[in-house]
Amino acid sequence: MIQDFHQMISAALGISERQISQTLGLLEDGATIPFISRYRKEVTGGLEVQIESIKTHYEKLSETAKRKETILNTIQEQGKLTAELQKRIEETWDNTLLEDIYLPYKPKRKTRAEAARQKGLEPLATLLMLQREPHPEERAAGYVKGDVKNVEDALKGARDIIAEHVSEDERARNSVRNAFARQGILTAKVVKGKEEEATKYRDYFDCSESLKRCSSHRLLAIRRAEAEGLLKVSISPDDEECVERLERQFVRSNNACGQQVAEAVQDSYKRLLKPSIETEFATQSKERADEEAIKVFAENLRQLLLASPLGQKRVMGIDPGFRTGCKVVCLDAQGNLLHNENIYPHPPVSKQKEAFAKLQMMIESYKIDAVAIGNGTASRETEEFLKHQRFNRDIQIFIVSEQGASIYSASKIARDEFPDYDVTVRGAVSIGRRLMDPLAELVKIDPKSIGVGQYQHDVDQTKLKKSLDQTVENCVNLVGVNLNTASSHLLTYISGLGPQLAQNIVNYRAENGAFTSRKELMKVPRMGAKAFEQCAGFLRIPDAGNPLDNTAVHPESYHIVEQMAKDLGCSVAELIADKELRRKIQPERYLSPTVGMPTLKDILQELEKPGRDPRGPIKVFEFDKNVRTIDDLRIGMELPGIVGNITNFGAFVDIGIKENGLIHLSQLAQKYVSNPNEIVSIHQQVRVKVLSVDTERKRIQLTMIGVSG
């Protein structure tokens, strides 16, 4: 069966069976996706993003295999498992078809057909199905006894048995299924009396569109409204055509028996078949929409986590506000809290001179290099206030997304970090740290609270969590972490660690001081050879005695670099420092049965830029000073903005006011765009033009087409 899995995954993904087999072997051996992707390229044939797809396909096939086992056991217990049926089940890997095969044998709650069978009406149903008897009423009279009160009662029971038979027939189900697939219409109507409550869904009050053309965001919006009891939703094909197809299959005579069967077919379609297939399509379309939404969310999260960091600078974090003032914190270059203060530069208090004096004192005393202002209430006013002041030090001012900061400030992680401070201080610290290192700070927050998803509360939560966790893990390992400063929460996402080992590393660091080498990791309690293999390459030690400990070169490959240095008559440190020496390296000399060119290329790239951060430098940004509210917007106005969220129908842009504007997919570029990520990315600075403004619904339509500069 495992070999069958390899063949099926290979066919589905267009990857060789050998690559599938090797990759699954590594996964089964406990290797993580980041480790395999980075350090086992020779084994997998250079697979990267496909590794996750291989794992997902394998898990789905394994689930199907378990389901088949359950089905076979159930039918076996009924004594109905024939060799032919067993072979058919074993050869079927399509879940829908598998359930169709199983349906006649599936244990049921008491149905109308089952009740009719218990009354002894199955022979009558069989007689009707043969459609040879000219006078079925006369034959039905012989069944009038006990609970069967009259002839019509007998015929009705027989029709119920036929209706169930029709609904469980594979060909019949496929016929109706094909009709749904080709011509299924999704219809939504507002629930009577709920018009006012459902205002935000008014686009769907009387909606009718092809299911196969319905975009995922529309489908999820409709399903959300349905769940809230505001819309009635249905999916339907051409009912007449479906019934005609079924009648052609089951009705073979125009006589009285044929008429009974035709009546049973119509009942079967309306009462059993159509609702069953409608549920199937509702589930499948929702699953597809979920997958698309989760994919969008994961990509947005990836871009957000890989946003450019300011780095190890002294930062002032400000959580702005009007009535309650602005909470200000000062952080050292490692993000440790040095000081916190409240200032009140805005109405109703308006103590601007006092606020400036406090800021001046903090900036000088703590040698602040940059200020991070949260982008919530009073953000623009606070930015403007700071930019109008002349401080004795040059400082850069940044606007930082504070989405999820309040969630973090009330979390256990925040309480453990700052047990003696309230939520306002913790929130301001989070804003400051997000500027220094977005990745290290955002991993502390449930990704669903970061606000870059599309209907994230409506999709399958288990699948969403799995995808987002894998995204965080991929990002953390792509960047790597400083072994001597990383929090236990950040370390948790490092390949091969997890919560317990991450905490053990932090405890070891607290008791023994900073790590001086990667080898020292082996002294951490419960750190075995396998965990070390998986994590070591992603952990950096900037001041280590061995310079390779601050690179992505894995300890298992140190001997290769050492041999390169030896062959050139220099030390490893000299090799890293001297570009001319590195040019003399002939990588093919270091090939071996276990080390191929992919690994050697990665090593040489790492020696070129040891410990390189893939995230790039941060840029300062300014909003238009003349736009403060939605009422300041005019059609045709051009504005600077920052992409805050991406969906499959476009991108939402922060233009410095409370409401974000939407650039629809069709307005991202002159050319056809199928995926917004082809044009924009999270946190990208863009220039946009205002297309329309709906102040009542707080909706702003923007375009990037025909924008100057």
Give, region by region, the residue ranges found by the protein language model.
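A glycine-rich phosphate-binding loop feature that marks nucleotide/adenosyl-phosphate handling sites
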Residues: N178-I185, I318-F322, G376-E381, V400-I407, ...
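Long, highly charged, low-complexity intrinsically disordered interaction regions
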Residues: I2-F5, T56-L81, E90, D416-A514, ...
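Short, ordered loop/turn segments at secondary-structure junctions
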Residues: Y39-K41, M129, D238, P320, ...
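Duplex nucleic acid-engaging cores and interfaces of nucleic-acid transaction enzymes
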Residues: Q50-S53, K60, T64-G317, R323-Y421, ...
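Structured, non-catalytic alpha/beta "coupling" segments that mediate domain-domain communication
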Residues: T74, E99-I101, A225-D238, R248-L273, ...
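Single-stranded RNA-binding regions, centering on S1/OB-family and related RNA-binding modules
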Residues: I541-G709
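Generic start-of-chain signal for non-secretory N-termini
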Residues: M1-S21, E28
